């Protein structure tokens, strides 16, 4: 619980800094919280945080910073210089490289000078972790000099860097106290000189081309080495590194973990290694020809032979943040789910698998492979009859699959058939969730479904499937959540257009869904109402009214119009896209029941009152006058509505300012009907009533009736 609250708090602070509204100058965050805030700020701003240098300098106390794939610039250098760092991931050098080009070879970056610019004296004395992976070429002799400014460095990552002939040996001599070294995907021709690293415990050399024993013989001088990674991102049929390792007849006595995925390892070679390495505890062999070990070995084998072993492998790689390996395991799991047999793999935990896959997607958001493969895996799990879930896990599964639908344009699974199947799966899961009878928060379900509806890239069939989900669950979330779901006001126009299409196709249930959504949004978002009033979809809504036949549908549209127009009271609306020619209302005049008549009159009165200079009010005014004698004695206006009109100010505004009979008649009718149900109602508008002067006979008669009630 404490960790969850801490995450929420740090994320809020990051958003406040990003929005420029964090002003708590009296309190300086501790280093742990500062690191978390800075990390979240990087994600929110996509690395472009130089605008917030002052806030960062004033309020944060950074110790551990990792820019990952984000680009650093000179402003970043200035910020980092002010902090005492203990670990640093330097990020992409595209921006900063121009200012630190080597004087002799301007195609290279002088990393030594860049590090001196970033690291103040205190940082140099304390920095124990440095990640400078990337593809930019560094200037000559950087490996020889780096140790002079980083005396206590223990961990170094230089993945992907181009190293010249003697660079590696100089590096080992320059920083002899390293305990962790990652030289993956570098062009190291051999590891001669690694003997200088007497304290090295972890050596990561994925996809390093070492083809003969002489190129890595110095490896066996590392008597304290506990972790060795010689894996390959892609299998090559001619790779022989494990065979050469075994043929050397040498042993790393302290070795605990061997990562050899994608290599030439087989069961025979692995047996020989296990027989000679007494302390070996774990071997990773993904995409290798090994399914299991002999029973007498107690070593744990990481592979993807079964779903159970795959899940353990996934947990391991996620823990060490090995992105490519997480992708590889998820991809392999895709081929295992259709073949799942509970009799052969009865220890597999579907619920735990869902948690780990979702956690993978959350922790490594930048990987499209993890997002795509993860969604496919979850889809397979959701369709499996043997899977059993707790309600919260079920909810998380639904949300993640909805993410998959929304992101289908970015992922590599965006086929129409798959997306339809995915929607059907989501609908089935939601029914299961309903039957669990557990209270759940459906904000995220509504938010993602709403994004699917409003997003142009999502095809019509996908939107059609999102609408009933949105309509069902928008009724179960708070009014504030409804407001934020349509904060960009793109959803309602899309729903209105879909309503029009549903009417044309006579899809009764889609009409109901669309009207329910519009009702909920217009009741809870004043901004959305204002935006809708100004767009052409308002006229489409009136057109829909004219094309509908059911009284209940008429009533829903009238309520939506009332919600929109009521929110515009006292708003300075410069344009309203509503057709004041009320032919669509007049055509069905004879069919009106009392409730529809009330809402029609309310809509007309609000048009007259709110837009005196924008629309032609006379048709609306005439219709109210014409029909008023017939309906004034039968309409019953809800007192709850009347109180809204008082609180909103529309009654006061009409009684004080209006010179149109139509709106005045409506206001007096509201007062009369409400007084008949609640005598105290008139006290709310005594002054306005007494100041109302008019020569209109029909209005004078209404005033007299109200006085008689008093």
From Swiss-Prot:
Superkingdom classification of source: Eukaryota
Primary localization: membrane
Protein topology in the membrane: Single-pass membrane protein
Subcellular localization, as worded in the UniProt entry: Membrane
InterPro entries: ARM-type_fold, LRR_dom_sf, LRR_Zer-1, Zyg-11_UBL_adapter
UniProt keyword annotation of Metal-binding present: no
Family annotation (Gene3D superfamilies): Ribonuclease Inhibitor
Gene Ontology CC annotation, any one: Cul2-RING ubiquitin ligase complex
Transmembrane spans: 597-615
Keyword Transmembrane helix part of the UniProt annotation: yes
Keyword tags: Membrane, Transmembrane, Transmembrane helix
Pfam families: LRR_Zer-1 (PF25013)
Name this polypeptide is given: Gastrulation-defective protein 3
Lineage: Eukaryota, Metazoa, Ecdysozoa, Nematoda, Chromadorea
Gene that specifies this protein: gadr-3
